[in-house]
A protein has these predicted regions:
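Acidic, metal-ion-coordinating active-site neighborhood of RNase H-like domains
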Residues: 7-9
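Donor nucleotide-sugar binding loop of glycosyltransferases
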Residues: 12
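Cross-kingdom TIR/SEFIR domain
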Residues: 3-5, 15-97
Length: 97
């Protein structure tokens, strides 16, 4: 089972990567979209890992607040009581979903 599911905008990948690396170095199994096998249905694969994860970290930026995928993944994680929101930059309340 995945410990932590990462939800973020692909535009933020390089800002999220060091966090992923640090958590992995501490022994956490981190799932992020770079692990989706070629030919696999992306939506199904992502949803399965999100639901099975112990927690989900949504990384918020000016880009990710506009991403339907990030917003949906955060909503699902919140409904399951396992959402951890991380601000990558200052945002206003009005920018959040």
């Amino acid at each position: 089972m995945t410990d932590i599911f990462f939800s973020y905008s692909s535009a933020d990948r390089e800002r999220v990567r060091p966090i992923r690396d640090a958590l992995a170095a501490q022994g956490f199994e981190v799932f992020w979209d770079q692990q989706v096998p070629a030919g696999m249905d992306w939506d199904t694969w992502i949803r399965q890992h999100l639901i099975k994860s112990k927690c989900a970290m949504a990384f918020w930026s000016a880009t990710s607040v506009s991403s339907d995928n990030v917003r949906h993944e955060a909503m699902v994680a919140k409904q399951q009581g396992k959402l951890i929101s991380v601000l990558l930059e200052p945002l206003t309340v009005e920018q959040f979903p």
